Every structure is written in C-alpha cells, then in structure tokens.
C-alpha cells in the first residue's frame, strides 16, 4: 500500500486508465473492461471537491463505451484525455511558498490492486 500525506486543500487526481484502474487492454477482450481491486474504494474515498482527470491511449471513438462502463461502476471523473502516447507520463508543478509539495507520483505494477491511502494532515 502507498501512503500519501497531504494537505486538506482540494486536489487534482491524474490517473491512467489501463492497468491502473481497469485490466490493461481489457476493452479488447470479449468480456470487456474490468475494474481492478481497490478502485471502487479509492474513488469512493475522494472528497467531492477533488477533480479527477483520466489518461488513456485509447482512441476517442471508443470513449463512450469506457465512459458508460465507468458510470455503471460509479467511477467519477471530470475529464478523460484520449489518444495519448504510450510512453512516460510526466507531471511538473511548483511548490507552495510555504514549501508544501504540490505534485506526487505513484508508480504501481500493471493490473495490481489500486492501494493508495491518503492521510489528510491539517498541519500542512
């Protein structure tokens, strides 16, 4: 399990789709997409004011099927970016003047459960 100690400020969550929240390339299987363990619980734990951005290399034209699947499983998102390159995802952000880090990265093994524990620290 990954534990992140963060402030209580609203957050932007950026998550890849395949291999992170659903089985990698599951949409190509006859049974279709399948949520990975821990995904429902993780999304249920996100405060309503947080923003969720999903990233995928999938083609935009199959987006409605993914979006319907996510809605059926109560996985909320604000934006999905489609047709992204399959290479590394790089996040760059500045620190707050107080020194508070404003960017985190979690690398998880493909198709493993999503296991992130967030500690909201009011002193940060």
Name the predicted role of every residue range:
Residues 1-124:
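HAD-like aspartate-dependent phosphatase fold
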